[in-house]
């Protein structure tokens, strides 16, 4: 899959951008010029300089350093949310599509109930119940996205259940774990990857939006949405304070969406047709 992605120019550029952000987040203590929470009231709203490559905020903190460390609390939490969502939904979807019967009916009716609520309404409702915080955001986004993936994976499993190699495995009573990793997962991996790459952008926007509203990451932890919230009071006098985190969010979300579109063109037979 990776080799095929690298043959597409847009996908290669998107992977390069996401890889650069990921590496910057991992090595943030080395790359960032300052401690992201270090305040210097003698340098508030400092202009761009060698000391502050993107200037300083209202507390004299380095904006570039906070953007770099913000990768950990925005992008990495989005990756983690999608990872647990995909892991759980893959297992549930394959079990539902492979076993059928009352278990399948119960899982599907539960998904129907969850899907009857708009994702944004469900996320806000769950955070209202669980309380603000990044843990609540991860749980809320996980529950909001889980039924979508369970239904998609289940339908794919049902489609592959009628293939000869799956029927043969059922005939000789092959272990479920073998069928999971040998038959089902390789066939649905591309579909999962396409949806996940586009939904990462949605999760990033969700984390940033909720942090902007004060329901996410607690200050002074650097996070892109929280940085936007802090900068909104000086929008007219120092618009660059909102521009830097806003443009960063736009670049990452657009990159994820373009990567998803490129993967769909490469791996979806309907798109190729």
What residue ranges belong to the model's regions?
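Generic hydrophobic transmembrane alpha-helix motif, especially the helices
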Residues: 53, 57, 97-98, 103, ...
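Membrane-cytosol interface at the C-terminal ends of specific transmembrane alpha-helices
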Residues: 82, 90, 94, 132-182, ...
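Transmembrane-helix boundary motif in ABC transporter permease subunits
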Residues: 28-31, 78-112, 124
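Short helix-to-coil transition segments within interhelical loops
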Residues: 56-61, 98-99, 168-187, 228
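C-terminal transmembrane helix and the adjacent membrane-cytosol boundary/short C-terminal tail
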Residues: 143-144, 190, 194-200, 239-273
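Periplasmic/extracellular loop-to-transmembrane helix junction in inner-membrane transport proteins
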Residues: 1-4, 34-82, 229-246
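N-terminal signal-anchor/first transmembrane alpha helix
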Residues: 1-34, 110, 188
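Non-cytoplasmic
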Residues: 124-125, 129, 133-145, 192-227
